[in-house]
Amino acid sequence: MLVRPQEPYPQSEPPAAVGRMVQIPYVTVPLYAALLIALGWFGGEQWRNKPEPQPMRQSVAHAALVPLNQPAVKAAVAPVNAGPEIQAEPEIAIDEDNLPPLRYSAHVYASLADKRSIVLNGQSWKEGDSPLANLVIEHIQQDLTVFSFNGKTFTLAALDDWPGGAIEESPQAE
C-alpha cells in the first residue's frame, strides 16, 4: 500500500495572520489617539504637586459652643487717659425660681445609659449630672431630655434651646 503524504491545508490561500500586520481602519485611529491622550491627561493628575492646604478659619459652629450665661469676651484695650475707674459688670445672678437660658447643641441617645449624653452651654453632660445649681438631668430619651429643677420635672425636646424663665407645671412635664 502506498501512502501519499497529505498537505496540512490547501495552498491556494495563505493564512491571514501569519506574517501580516493587522491594519486598523482609518476612522478609529483618531478615536484611539484621543483615548490615549485622555488617559495620559487624567492619569497625570495623580502625580502632580498638590497645593498646600490653607489654614482653617474659625467655623461658625464654634460660636454655638460659647455658653449663653457668660458675658461676651472683649479684647483688651490699653487706656489712653487715666479716667475714673470703670466698674465691671456684675455676673448674671441666678434666681432660685428662674432657670437661666440653656443652649442645647448636641444630643446622643444609646441603648446603654452610660453612652447617653447631651451638650448644654458647650459642655457635655450625662444622666444624673447637674449642669447648674438645682438642675439635674434625670433621663436622656431618644427625642427629649427630662430635667428636674428645684424638684419640678420638665422635658426639653432634643436640640431645643431653653430661653430662660420659670418652670411651670404642665401635662408634658412628666
From Swiss-Prot:
TM region positions: 24-44
Q: Which Pfam families match?
A: T2SSB
InterPro entries from the UniProt entry: GspB_C
Keyword list, A-Z: Membrane, Transmembrane, Transmembrane helix, Transport
- Looking at the keywords, is Membrane present? yes
Q: How does it sit in the membrane?
A: Single-pass membrane protein
Where mainly located? Answer: membrane
Task: List the GO cellular component terms.
Answer: membrane; type II protein secretion system complex
Give the UniProt subcellular location, in the record's own words: Membrane
* Record keyword Transmembrane helix present: yes
This protein's source sits in the domain of life called Bacteria
**Protein family per UniProt:** Belongs to the ExeB/OutB/PulB family.
What NCBIfam families does the annotation carry?
T2SS_GspB
Name of the protein described by the UniProt record: General secretion pathway protein B
Q: Which organism is it from?
A: Klebsiella pneumoniae
